[in-house]
Every structure is written in structure tokens, then in C-alpha cells.
From Swiss-Prot:
GO function term, MF aspect, one: transcription coregulator activity
Family assignment from sequence similarity: Belongs to the Mediator complex subunit 10 family.
Function in brief: Component of the Mediator complex, a coactivator involved in the regulated transcription of nearly all RNA polymerase II-dependent genes. Mediator functions as a bridge to convey information from gene-specific regulatory proteins to the basal RNA polymerase II transcription machinery. Mediator is recruited to promoters by direct interactions with regulatory proteins and serves as a scaffold for the assembly of a functional preinitiation complex with RNA polymerase II and the general transcription factors.
Subunit structure: Component of the Mediator complex.
Residues annotated as signal peptide: none
Keyword Nucleotide-binding: no
Protein name stated in the entry: Mediator of RNA polymerase II transcription subunit 10
GO biological process: regulation of transcription by RNA polymerase II
Organism this protein belongs to: Anopheles gambiae
GO cellular component, one term: mediator complex
InterPro entries: Mediator_Med10
Length: 130
């Protein structure tokens, strides 16, 4: 038994193939091909009805930005790549901030140890940093 997602994929592939065949028929239309065209269009409508029936079996949230990519003629898979690139950039920024805070803490502890050695010793003992 196929999963609902696989079933939807199969129906979408059949729909796309139907559209491709209709495009071929229409691009070189001959009057004797009217019956075939009508059958293909009916098959297209039936396919859309089948796809519509499957919508309740699958809960997929597609970010609106993906549709923007499609509207702009871009590959929707680039959206995933762009999201990963943005996450990587943000991760590098956060890592830089963490490293800066660690250096600041280290320098601060060093300076405070020189200025207030007794208090810093007590602080380190309480924190368990020794």
C-alpha cells in the first residue's frame, strides 16, 4: 500500500504527463484529433478531482516564499538552499558573539584577579571555577 504522499506524487505525475500530452496535441492541432483532445481534457479534470480528494489526507505547509520563487521563475529548491545559507550565516554571527563574550569574560576575570585577588578567589570557589 502506498503512503498518501506517494499517492499524491503519482497523481501529480500523471497530471503533469496529461498536461504535456495536451500541449503536444494543441501545438499541432488537427480537427480529427478533437476527440482525443476532449478525452485528454476530461482526463485532466478527473485528475484534478482526484488530487482534490487527496488534499485531506496530507497536511503539508509550504512557505509562501516558495511560491514567490516559482512566480519569479526560480527553482523552488533554491529556497531550501537559501534558508540553509541564511542559517549558516546567522550561526557564524552568533558563534562570533559567543567567542567575543568568552574573551571578554577571560579578560575581565584576569583584570579583576589583579585588582581584587581575594574577592575573585572567593567568587571562583563559590562558582567552582578553580
Amino acid at each position: 500500500m502506498t503512503s498518501p504522499l506517494e499517492n499524491l506524487e503519482n497523481h501529480l505525475e500523471m497530471f503533469i504527463e496529461n498536461v504535456r500530452q495536451i500541449r503536444i496535441i494543441v501545438s499541432d492541432f488537427q480537427p480529427q484529433g478533437q476527440n482525443v483532445l476532449n478525452q485528454k481534457i476530461q482526463s485532466l479534470v478527473t485528475g484534478l478531482q482526484e488530487i482534490d480528494k487527496l488534499k485531506n489526507q496530507i497536511d503539508v505547509n509550504v512557505p509562501l516564499e516558495v511560491f514567490d520563487y516559482i512566480d519569479q521563475g526560480r527553482n523552488p529548491q533554491l529556497y531550501t538552499k537559501d534558508c540553509i545559507d541564511k542559517a549558516l550565516t546567522k550561526n557564524e554571527e552568533v558563534k562570533g558573539k559567543i567567542d567575543s563574550y568568552r574573551k571578554f569574560k577571560s579578560n575581565l576575570m584576569k583584570e579583576l584577579s589583579e585588582t581584587f585577588p581575594v574577592e575573585i578567589s572567593k567568587y571562583k570557589a563559590i562558582r567552582g571555577d578553580e
